[in-house]
Amino acid sequence: MALALLALLLVPALRQWLTASMWRHMVLQFPLWMLAGAWLVAGLPPAARAHVARWNAHGISGLVGTGTVLAVLMVPRVLDLALVSLPIEAAKCAALLLAGAALRLSWRAAGLVVQGFFLGNMLPMMAVVGQLYIDSPLRLCNAYLLDDQARLGAWLVTAAAALAVGWLVKVVWWVVRRDVLVEQQVAQAAQATEKAKAGVASNAHDPATIN
């Protein structure tokens, strides 16, 4: 699946279509390259995952790397250069591939606290950049028109809000599920205690046990 997606992304016609629009360039092409990276590392053997985990405690290193890549690639000048320079385009795609792999290997290990810290930095940055694209009276990217720039800004603000809501829903679901499991465990422990007490009382009144 990962190799098929990579092959598709390397098709010149698709690449040209994705980069012809500023919002498709950032909102579609970026996530697709990251998805390919995530799929590539999905089948890593346990030994390789353990080796990566040595320098990626709690997913911090991977998430910092992912955040750095995305922050750099949101700079308008980088988008312009990627369109006219093949080495920079290749570096951009490789960085997104690695960012997707790092995100896949780091997200679950990070836990809710580190995830919240990561999203608490990335999502406001996305929203601020998006609002700047919307409000700017000047073209920030020479290769794209002003209305396309504003459209990208709207997409970034919407995506940041949607990701924030989605993660908060996940947190609420996890907390509710944890509380339900705790209540079930407490109820099971209480039932086991009652059964044990009933067994002791039954043995105490059993003549054969008394004798």
Spans of features found by a protein language model:
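Alpha-helical membrane segments of multi-pass proteins
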Residues: 1-211
